[in-house]
Amino acid sequence: MDKIIKSISTSGSFRAYVLDCTETVRTAQEKHQTLSSSTVALGRTLIANQILAANQKGNSKVTVKVIGDSSFGHIISVADTKGNVKGYIQNTGVDIKKTATGEVLVGPFMGNGHFVVITDYATGQPYTSTTPLITGEIGEDFAYYLTESEQTPSAVGLNVLLDDEDKVKVAGGFMLQVLPGASDEEISRYEKRIQEMPSISSLLESENHIESLLSAIYGEDDYKRLSEDSLAFYCDCSKERFEAALLTLGTKELQAMKDEDKGVEITCQFCNQTYYFTEEDLEKIINDSIK
């Protein structure tokens, strides 16, 4: 089961989130049938979104839009405070071969664009914040967003590793943030440790990557675990929700779907689930719309 562990240094100067998102990203790959580069790009976005949502409380939802001008197109993800995330990538078929070190290229196929975060506090007034893409690798873009938009210096590592058949082998990451009151000496020590830590890929490949990530982040500094929560790919779409959307269409358009198309099918962008509305279904919706 996927999970996120929240921790804090004993000094109270740093906090870190570490995540195992393997099943989450594997489910996304299966639902969208993404090829290698698209899988990694979508997976990194889902991981970043789960970190952002873990910072929220109540019934808040966080939408992340990675908007590029290259092969991937847009990547859209939505996460809630209960550990659920869903998402999709416009171009599922980017399949660029791995580099000599086994890494899958992402940045060149994201291109120029923006990292957009929309936080819905369930009050009817969502808050939107936008920062430019720095590298298109998503992890660096996420760290830049945290530092620039949320004014919190952060180190981030996100990745998705694939097996020889380009299926998800492991996915996860971390976020480390400086908290108010951290001394210059502490900041320098953590900066040095992050600069010298093994690559996120090598840490994810270790037998227990959650423990490896925590050890790499904190080193000899003491820390305590604050919480451990489950994570999952989950889409809240339903036939009823799409029926409500159809109700917003005009009677003329609904009648055309019934008479000319003999029904309609709608596919959810976030999970690829398809819903079918027969002529009888549409007749009922038409009758409901004119009541």
UniProtKB/Swiss-Prot annotation:
The keyword Chaperone applies. It holds the Pfam family HSP33. Disulfide bonds join C235-C237, C268-C271. CDD domains: Hsp33 (cd00498). One of its GO terms (cellular component) is cytoplasm. Belongs to the HSP33 family. Keywords: Chaperone, Cytoplasm, Disulfide bond, Redox-active center, Zinc. Under oxidizing conditions two disulfide bonds are formed involving the reactive cysteines. Under reducing conditions zinc is bound to the reactive cysteines and the protein is inactive. It comes from the Bacteria. This is 33 kDa chaperonin. GO terms for molecular function: protein folding chaperone; unfolded protein binding. NCBIfam families: PRK00114.1. It is found in: Cytoplasm. Gene3D superfamilies: Hsp33 domain, HSP33 redox switch-like. Redox regulated molecular chaperone. Protects both thermally unfolding and oxidatively damaged proteins from irreversible aggregation. Plays an important role in the bacterial defense system toward oxidative stress. InterPro entries: Heat_shock_Hsp33, Heat_shock_Hsp33_C, Heat_shock_Hsp33_N. One of its GO terms (biological process) is protein refolding. The keyword Cell cycle does not apply.
